[in-house]
């Protein structure tokens, strides 16, 4: 059982002294922001299963904050010492406008196309950006998108983030190739806190791919990420997160996207690893003509647990969103999808859809799907749907009649089922990489 002290979030490693240590050399405004976040964290109760948004994820059973320490790893700038899996992932991501590599919370490599840098594109560690671009960071970091008040974990992250990523695209600048970030985690019994801040100015265009990797952990490790993506008027932004963490990882991510007038802001969350995954994704449509496509793909085996909590907030007239989350579950894995479309008063002309589909590959696998609508306008087109089913017998029979063995036929059906998500955001390299990981998991099913 958790102690009362732990339920309020105070542990041997997570405490005001840790916040002060991180803030000691930071500007006053950031010190105050961290301190405020810790105050919010302390007074915000730890989520329990009594809350609808946490009903299927019991933190008493899935997260032991008291056993976690903050990272003590040294910065690894020598590429020869980097893990082989990390280097392999980077080798697959050569086609890019820029790269960043983060190992155990330290940014150890950054490069950006010289022509884009000359146009004002910024790709930097968040610590460097605080020093070099204080006005931009102060305006956007933990303010409108993911403030500390967003929740218990958002407050903890805002107080204890160690480093992160800042990507800025000036007005009218288009990046033809994606920005690729590769993160590696190695320490067991550790809590990692990082942030992603992306600002795309008027009529800019950018794609961002964030891949998280680790081997299996000997004891539980938590990776906490707060993601803030801001698309100004007429900007086009794609945000992709590929989570491939090892067993023993508790992956927690709070993501908020802000889409202004006539902008397009699409997201893709791929969850293949970690023992426990919790993603809170909120898309806010803030200007007429704004659009957001929200895609998700997950594949579970063993006793993996996935919990996706999504919301589509249509705050003004004539905005659109379309969510599609699909997952395949084997072994005793469990997925939870909870989604809501909110149409605010006066937001006429809203066009919003939400679909969650699950494929159960084992009698012990489980999926819970809870789509919902909250509509306060009358001239709207909104729908939601959810399905939970088994492998299509007719599809398997057809493939077997063409000479394929049963196991191979089942793999093709699963790949086809999940492939619909990837086909909607065919970003170079991502589709192939994710497909390979899914094939590997399918090939190793018991």
Question: Which residues does each predicted region cover?
Answer:
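Conserved beta-strand/loop scaffold segments within soluble protein domains that form the structured core
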Residues: 119-122, 126-404, 418, 422-446
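N-terminal amphipathic, basic helical "cap/leader" segment at the start of enzyme domains
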Residues: 2-155, 324, 329-330
